Amino acid sequence: ILISNNNTISTMESCTGGGVSNAITNIEGSSSIFKFGAVTYSNEYKIKMGVNSDIIDEYSVYSMETANEMSKKISDFTISDYGIGITGKINRIDNNNLFGEDNRVFISIYDRNMNKFYNSEVITTDGSRSYNKDIIINNVIEMLLGILK
């Protein structure tokens, strides 16, 4: 759908580790629509990519506010029609970021042309990290398809 609409997309992923970028680039012809994928696993690199540190400090890195910052900043950085931001905790305690609920992931898709955020939360299971990443990635792709239709 992105290809036929001549839209572009970029991602800033944390807990999915580039899985959404991988899913998009598995589609033949995706080079015409996929501009950039960043895996910003640490706060430092989220901030270097433009995420406002005050947002992280006020709401935590594991928040919809941070996911929104990620999706908008990656769209702005790459001048993409859509930006995807994903942050959250999967099956673990993060000693560097003590706030936020375990097994809760925040997904934001920013539509640059409409200046609009589409948001979703996924509650993961106690299954493996790989299994939970697949659930999140599938949710993002389904969400994106719903926006584009």
Regions found by a protein language model. Name each.
Residues 1-149:
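Short alpha-helical segments enriched in small residues
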